[in-house]
Structures are given as structure tokens and as C-alpha cells.
Amino acid sequence: MRSLTVASRHPGAAFSTRRRPLLHPAAAGRDSTFQRCWRWEKTQDSSFGSSLRTSRLPRTVHGDILKNLLAPTAGAVSVEQAEAIADLPKGDMWSVHKFGGTCMGTSERIHNVADIVLRDPSERKLVVVSAMSKVTDMMYNLVNKAQSRDDSYIAVLDEVFDKHMTTAKDLLAGEDLARFLSQLHADISNLKAMLRAIYIAGHATESFSDFVVGHGELWSAQMLSYAIQKSGTPCSWMDTREVLVVNPSGANQVDPDYLESEKRLEKWFSRCPAETIIATGFIASTPENIPTTLKRDGSDFSAAIIGSLVKARQVTIWTDVDGVFSADPRKVSEAVILSTLSYQEAWEMSYFGANVLHPRTIIPVMKYNIPIVIRNIFNTSAPGTMICQQPANENGDLEACVKAFATIDKLALVNVEGTGMAGVPGTANAIFGAVKDVGANVIMISQASSEHSVCFAVPEKEVALVSAALHARFREALAAGRLSKVEVIHNCSILATVGLRMASTPGVSATLFDALAKANINVRAIAQGCSEYNITIVLKQEDCVRALRAAHSRFFLSKTTLAVGIIGPGLIGRTLLNQLKDQAAVLKENMNIDLRVMGIAGSRTMLLSDIGVDLTQWKEKLQTEAEPANLDKFVHHLSENHFFPNRVLVDCTADTSVASHYYDWLKKGIHVITPNKKANSGPLDRYLKLRTLQRASYTHYFYEATVGAGLPIISTLRGLLETGDKILRIEGIFSGTLSYIFNNFEGARTFSDVVAEAKKAGYTEPDPRDDLSGTDVARKVIILARESGLGLELSDIPVRSLVPEALKSCTSADEYMQKLPSFDEDWARERKNAEAAGEVLRYVGVVDVVSKKGQVELRAYKRDHPFAQLSGSDNIIAFTTSRYKDQPLIVRGPGAGAEVTAGGVFCDILRLSSYLGAPS
């Protein structure tokens, strides 16, 4: 093995508190590294070497470059010759940290990194760093421009120099700054010579490119070392090309040589026995000591390899997120940070495209059960996500068994099908041999147990080659009919459901496919290994995000998460929104009921949200962010939002056209809750059709507030019927407005004065005739009659209107109120007649179930009757049944007003939640 030469002024000896100069083989060993690289390149690429030797540079410049690059530093010694000073300790005393380019992006961030390292109480610390943010891309760009003979590579190199010089000046001072800038100048000079040679040759081999690119890590490691040294902490920095040895194993892949790397690390440590070591990420050497890199996510890989070599207690990878998400937060805003993952779960997620770790990063630490912790450098209070051997199972329920979801897009599904495949040995080998020959990557395989077909997923960009190869390979079989087809399905995606404990938990697949079915997602292929670490599903790419949201919401959101659409932000709707705002947090905390208002629709405008309207600002947003009202679009927004498992439309209007849509909404799987009486008191055939659909499906339709506002009238009636009681008669004061009017129509007060008072207090509609006509009471009578099993139409109910015939033609409410006093004498006469009999007047609705009739009328009741005891705007309903024949069951309470009506609607929302699984 060739010696790795290092300068005698190597920083190998750890910094003492006296602050010895920070030096490294970069001063000399880096030149010798270039020598090795250069000697290797001469054997590999004579044209490049010739270009460097014969480039048309001035002789003096050419000579200076070669002297600067190739001359070994005086006094250099080999690693093998270094005298052992200390053995490398191994075990839990080591903690390994890795900081990526974002963490090292500015002088302020490097200072923060130094603080984190210094605050770590571990006995020994090994810190792996990437190049500063964007620097690696800039270095690759340098090489690409140079070999393309683009002179602008010089400007890019100047940008690299300026970036590091500016950072160093902000971070360092005095001798530290002078030493770093001296080395930086020397490195830039060397790079200019190399890039000039590449420019002349028009070509750069991989090892030269790797050598150039690796400088970013060298510079960031030096700057961090100086920053830590400023605190007086002993520190060394390591060029990992001297330690990590890897073997190329394929395109953009390398395999670590752990034994040789361990030997070199021990020798390095014998010269540099520091308690804090700053190591370069990403870069390494081949067994021939040629510079190379660890390819994609190389710095994470470096940290994992080094962590395994020292058998560290933990490897912490610092990034800019709080940990590993349960799904891509760009696609699923409700994705949560996972506290733990097993190695296998992290591997599966990484394979299927989740931004966790590269799968190979996990391999080195698994052998020694070393945890990897993903943490956020910008939020150090967050504990992050721990990836370890077997995380503790907090609760063992179904949801806990599914840890995360990941997706891969831009795939194609290849299906090879034919009766001639069954029982024929070697068919699968022939299929995948053809795929291998064109270098395609098979991501998923699924085979029918009958062996009639095999399908597999490949990247869309590779499917044309795969299809051609399969048609060529099976030309005869296709012609003979042994294979029926080689089919390609384009524009596919994979959704992977990952969880270590899915194998031991029944119902995971059923729950997953139920969620996809409810989201109207068609599954094209399925694969699941016997280990059951993941369930892989192929589906249309256009359905992928919707499927991801539906699956994630089913496993990670509460079963009683409700996507709510409010139609009609008038008096009742506005009050309901305020009640939801005040109570939402309590419901989520105490009952795990998560209510999300996804939209608010008025008659002119509507407000839509994908994740939920902020109810503290809904009024303002309805003014500033609203769009023109469109009921179809509003409903589509709610029904197509499969991010939430349950959807409910709350109609707070009194609009007939809105009520006419209930059937269609229920058919789409949207629950409906309303105080709107129009649907249940409308045409009987529509009502029966609506109720039939409700009973035949698992979609709920609640309308408690249609009768009695917030009073439990409908639920009481249903309870009686469902327990086998027989309803004989329902009689009650159903109108809060008319209850108020007749409760106060006594003594010397005139009827018109009481109506005016009720109007002023807000008890009546803007036009009091809407209340006094009795139609609203008739609708409530119809609703109760139909609940009791009577097939009555609204026209079957005789109604005594309290609006005189002469006033029905008034063109406005004001005109009506002006003319109403002329009828006070008639009302006074009727009241006196009742008083003379010891009675009071009450406006009531009656359902006579026995005679199958209903009516609305003004009746007189004795003063000791419960109906005569009312006050304010209270409602009272008496149920006479087989069980409650002698003493009717009475429900009494406030039956009018926005608060109680909205409260009744709110109760229906909570009732729906309980039906969906909320605790009682």
C-alpha cells in the first residue's frame, strides 16, 4: 500500500488550551494527494496528462504550477511510519454529529454548530461536516465548465473563494484567520492550475473531479475547527481521505472497506488523540489512495461509517427539520414528526423516496445497534426522530403499527401475461434477465399466484427500453400465443405504507384499502412481502396525492376528525361558527374530536380552505379572501378533500333550493346536519326518498334543530319509537315567537303592542307575518307526523293564520305593522272570552297519530295546564304514548333564538362524532 504522506506540521496533535497552530496535511498531504491522483491519471488518461504537461502556458508559469502542485513538503512522513502515541478508544464515550451544508451555510451558522458541539457533554465527540451550502454544486459546476471550455469557470472559482473568505473574516480573527486564508489562497491556486489543465484537455476524469469537489468539505472542516479552538477546547480536524477507504461497486455507488478504514483511523488517532475531532464528510479514498467521494448523501454515510468504526453511543444528523415526518409535509400538511423509527422502517421509507436518509446510511450502524437521531439545528429544543433497532411500542393500537407513508412518482407498470407462463421454469428469470440487460431498475414486483401474469414497476424514463427488450425476448412466445401480451401502463405512482408491527396486527390492509375506496382510488397493483414491513400499491399518478392524504388521515388523524362545510353564515351560522371557535380546542383535548371548517358559503361569496379556516378570523377572511359563491364548487371542495376521513355539510339557511341537494350530498358520502325545515316538510315523495337513502347507507342526516331549536324533541320521539312505545298524540307550542306573544298578551296590553315588542326584541322574522301565518308551526307538525309514521303533506294540515285577511296583501312589514292596531279590538275580545272561562290563549300544533291527522290552531287552556305556565319564548311539547298515557312526557325549554338553535346544530355535530367513534 502506498503511504499517505503528511506534513510534519500536521495538526495531528490535538490543540492544547494554549492554542497551538491549526495545521493539517492540506498543507502538504493535500499536495501529495494530488501527486497520487496525478500519477493515477497519467496511467488512465494520457491525453489529460499530456495536456497538463504541454499546455501553452508561459514556461515560468507552467513550472510554478507544477512545482506548487507536485513538490512534496519537506519533512513529510508516512502514516505507517508515525509512532503510535495513543490507542483509539471505542464505545459509548463517543458521540458522532453530522452537520450538512445548510447547517454550515454562514458564519453565524458555523458559530451555532460550534456551540452545539461544545454543549455536548459526551466524553469524546467526532463531528462530520459537509461543504458550505451550495458549494458542492459550485465545485461540480467548475469542473463542468472547465471541461466544456467555458471561461466562466474562473468567475465561479472566484465566487467560491469570496464565499469562504467572507465567512472566515466574519468567523475568525488574528492568526487563525491568517492561517486559514493562507491555506485557502494556496488551494485556490492549485485548483486554478488543475482547472486550466482540464480546460485545455476538454475532459476531466472522475477522480480529478472528485479531488476538486472535495475541497468544500476541507474548508468547512477547517473553519469549524478554528471556531471550536477559540473556546480553548482541544480539537483536531481530519481529512477523511486519509482514513475512509471505499471500493467502487457500480454507478454512483461505493462499498466501505471497514477493516482498512479502521486500521487507518487507529493510525490517524495515534497521532491526533483529541477528544474533539472535526472530520470531512463526503470524501474518501480508494485502496490505491486515489481521492473519491461517497456519492449521494455522502456526508450522512461518512458519519454512519465513522460512528460504526468508533462504536459510538449515537449518531446525530443535524438538518433543517424537526425530524422524520409521517408523510411528505408538502403533500400532507397534517404530517406529524415521528418520535422513533426502526432501522427497517427508515430503510423502507428511504427506498420509497422519503426524505429520511439514504438506505446505505443505515447499514453501518445496524451492526452495532447505534441509534441515528435526526434533529433540527434551528430548533434545538425539539427532540427529533430516533432511528434504532426496535422502538418501544407506546400503545399497540392499529394506528401505531403504521409509522409512515412514502410515494414514488413517474413510474410505469409493465404487465407480462399469458397462459403459457404457468408452471414453466425460468420465465421470471427470462423476464428480469431482459430487464437487467437494458440496465433498468425494477422498483416493485407482483405476481399472480396462478403464475398467469407478472407485473413490475420501473421508472417511466426506462420503460421504452424495457418494453422493447421484452418484446424482442418473447417474440416467439407472443407469436405462438403462449404469452398474450406485454403491456405498459404509463403515468403511475407507488404509495408505500410502512410499519414494523403491521405483520402482527390484523386489519391494517383492510383499513388502508377502505380509506382508498372511500377516496374513490383505483388500485392497479399490490405487493407485500411476508415480513410485512410495507404494503406497496401502484395507482394512477394523478391520484397519488389524494391517495396519500386519504391513507394518512385514516391512520394519523382522529377517527372523529370532521371536515365541516357551513352554508349560510347568517344569524344561526355566525353563532355556530363562534361556538365552534370557543369549543374546538376543548373537544380535541378531552374527546379527540377534531372539527375543521373547510369552507363557509354565503349567498354571494364563499371562503374555501384546504386545511381548515382560522375561526378567530373567519369574518375578516370572508371579506378579504372570498370568491364568488358557487354551491357546486363548494360541495366539490369538501367532497374531494380526502385528507380528512369524514365530511359534513351544515345547512344553516332556510332555503328550499339548498335543501333540495341533500339527497345528492348523502349519496356522495357527505353527512348532512341542518335546522332547515324545508326538506323534511317538503313533498312527501322526496322526503321518503331521502330517508330511504339515509337508512340504506352509513351516511348520517341529523335535523334535531328543525323542531324546538336546541330542545331534544326529535331524539326523544325517536327514543320512544325505537324502544317500542306507541305514539298516540303530540301537542305543543312549537314557535318561540308565538309563545312570547301569547305569554305577554295579557292585562291591558294590545296585541299590536306585543307584536311590535317581539319584533323589536328580535323574536320575529323581519316580516312578523312569516311567524303569524302559522306556516312554520305547520312545518314542524309535518316533521313530527312523518317521524311518527304518518304520510302527511303540508297541504293536509289545517292552519289558523293569525294574519287578518285584510292585511295579507300589505306590500311591506312596515305597512302591516301600521295597520295591525286596527284589529286590536278583535284580539281583545278573544282574550276576554278565554279569561272569562279561566283560560289563556296559546298557539299550538297537534299531531293526532290515532286519527292520522294534524292541525295548527289557537286554543284556550286552563291556567293550571302546563301550556299556561310558560314564560318568555319557551317551547313545550307533550308526548302522549302507550307508556305516558295518563301523564304525558313533557319537554320544555327555550325554543327560539340564535344561541339555542346553533347549540342544537352543534349537538348534532357532536352526535355525529359519537356515531363515528368519539368517546361518550
Curated annotation (Swiss-Prot):
<keyword id="KW-0560">Oxidoreductase</keyword>
<protein>
    <recommendedName>
        <fullName>Bifunctional aspartokinase/homoserine dehydrogenase 1, chloroplastic</fullName>
        <ecNumber>2.7.2.4</ecNumber>
        <ecNumber>1.1.1.3</ecNumber>
    </recommendedName>
</protein>
<keyword id="KW-0486">Methionine biosynthesis</keyword>
<feature type="domain" description="ACT 2">
    <location>
        <begin position="497"/>
        <end position="574"/>
    </location>
</feature>
<feature type="binding site">
    <location>
        <position position="897"/>
    </location>
    <ligand>
        <name>NADPH</name>
    </ligand>
</feature>
<comment type="subunit">
    <text>Homo- or heterodimer.</text>
</comment>
<dbReference type="InterPro" id="IPR036291">
    <property type="entry name" value="NAD(P)-bd_dom_sf"/>
</dbReference>
<dbReference type="GO" id="GO:0004412">
    <property type="term" value="F:homoserine dehydrogenase activity"/>
</dbReference>
<dbReference type="Pfam" id="PF22468">
    <property type="entry name" value="ACT_9"/>
</dbReference>
<keyword id="KW-0028">Amino-acid biosynthesis</keyword>
<dbReference type="GO" id="GO:0004072">
    <property type="term" value="F:aspartate kinase activity"/>
</dbReference>
<dbReference type="InterPro" id="IPR045865">
    <property type="entry name" value="ACT-like_dom_sf"/>
</dbReference>
<dbReference type="GO" id="GO:0009086">
    <property type="term" value="P:methionine biosynthetic process"/>
</dbReference>
<feature type="binding site">
    <location>
        <position position="604"/>
    </location>
    <ligand>
        <name>NADP(+)</name>
    </ligand>
</feature>
<dbReference type="GO" id="GO:0005524">
    <property type="term" value="F:ATP binding"/>
</dbReference>
<feature type="binding site">
    <location>
        <position position="776"/>
    </location>
    <ligand>
        <name>L-homoserine</name>
    </ligand>
</feature>
<dbReference type="InterPro" id="IPR002912">
    <property type="entry name" value="ACT_dom"/>
</dbReference>
<comment type="function">
    <text>Bifunctional aspartate kinase and homoserine dehydrogenase that catalyzes the first and the third steps toward the synthesis of lysine, methionine and threonine from aspartate.</text>
</comment>
<dbReference type="InterPro" id="IPR001048">
    <property type="entry name" value="Asp/Glu/Uridylate_kinase"/>
</dbReference>
<dbReference type="Pfam" id="PF00742">
    <property type="entry name" value="Homoserine_dh"/>
</dbReference>
<dbReference type="GO" id="GO:0070403">
    <property type="term" value="F:NAD+ binding"/>
</dbReference>
<keyword id="KW-0521">NADP</keyword>
<keyword id="KW-0547">Nucleotide-binding</keyword>
<dbReference type="Pfam" id="PF03447">
    <property type="entry name" value="NAD_binding_3"/>
</dbReference>
<feature type="binding site">
    <location>
        <position position="601"/>
    </location>
    <ligand>
        <name>NAD(+)</name>
    </ligand>
</feature>
<feature type="binding site">
    <location>
        <position position="572"/>
    </location>
    <ligand>
        <name>NADP(+)</name>
    </ligand>
</feature>
<feature type="binding site">
    <location>
        <position position="709"/>
    </location>
    <ligand>
        <name>Na(+)</name>
    </ligand>
</feature>
<keyword id="KW-0150">Chloroplast</keyword>
<keyword id="KW-0418">Kinase</keyword>
<feature type="binding site">
    <location>
        <position position="704"/>
    </location>
    <ligand>
        <name>Na(+)</name>
    </ligand>
</feature>
<dbReference type="InterPro" id="IPR036393">
    <property type="entry name" value="AceGlu_kinase-like_sf"/>
</dbReference>
<dbReference type="GO" id="GO:0009088">
    <property type="term" value="P:threonine biosynthetic process"/>
</dbReference>
<keyword id="KW-0809">Transit peptide</keyword>
<dbReference type="GO" id="GO:0050661">
    <property type="term" value="F:NADP binding"/>
</dbReference>
<feature type="region of interest" description="Disordered">
    <location>
        <begin position="1"/>
        <end position="21"/>
    </location>
</feature>
<dbReference type="InterPro" id="IPR005106">
    <property type="entry name" value="Asp/hSer_DH_NAD-bd"/>
</dbReference>
<feature type="binding site">
    <location>
        <position position="897"/>
    </location>
    <ligand>
        <name>NAD(+)</name>
    </ligand>
</feature>
<dbReference type="GO" id="GO:0009089">
    <property type="term" value="P:lysine biosynthetic process via diaminopimelate"/>
</dbReference>
<comment type="pathway">
    <text>Amino-acid biosynthesis; L-lysine biosynthesis via DAP pathway; (S)-tetrahydrodipicolinate from L-aspartate: step 1/4.</text>
</comment>
<dbReference type="GO" id="GO:0009507">
    <property type="term" value="C:chloroplast"/>
</dbReference>
<feature type="domain" description="ACT 1">
    <location>
        <begin position="416"/>
        <end position="491"/>
    </location>
</feature>
<feature type="region of interest" description="Aspartokinase">
    <location>
        <begin position="93"/>
        <end position="341"/>
    </location>
</feature>
